[in-house]
């Protein structure tokens, strides 16, 4: 986590992904140093769910007060990732449709 070799950040837009997002996060390997989960005003409160049930110290939840769509959520995550020492930023869907193993 956040080691010199872990220079990859992952952005996960979160909207109605509460049932799958913890499994997605758990499948992200140690080569990733930062995980930004963006709760896009999710009616299921995905961000709060992640904070309450995920113990991965790499995870930071970001929140939108108003839904901005997947593009807005991705941009919020990208901006946060750019503030880290990451060299690569990867967007992964929170519903499990993409293999999070890098």
Which ranges hold each PLM region?
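Structured catalytic core of nucleotide-sugar glycosyltransferases
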Residues: 1-102
């Amino acid at each position: 986590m956040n080691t010199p070799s872990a220079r990859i950040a992952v952005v996960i837009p979160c909207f109605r992904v509460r049932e799958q997002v913890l499994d997605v996060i758990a499948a992200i390997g140690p080569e990733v140093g930062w995980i930004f989960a963006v709760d896009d005003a999710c009616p299921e409160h995905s961000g709060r769910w992640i904070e309450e049930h995920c113990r991965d110290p790499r995870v930071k939840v970001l929140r939108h007060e108003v839904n901005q769509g997947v593009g807005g959520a991705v941009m919020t995550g990208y901006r946060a990732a750019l503030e880290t020492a990451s060299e690569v930023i990867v967007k992964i869907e929170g519903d499990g449709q993409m293999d999070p193993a890098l």
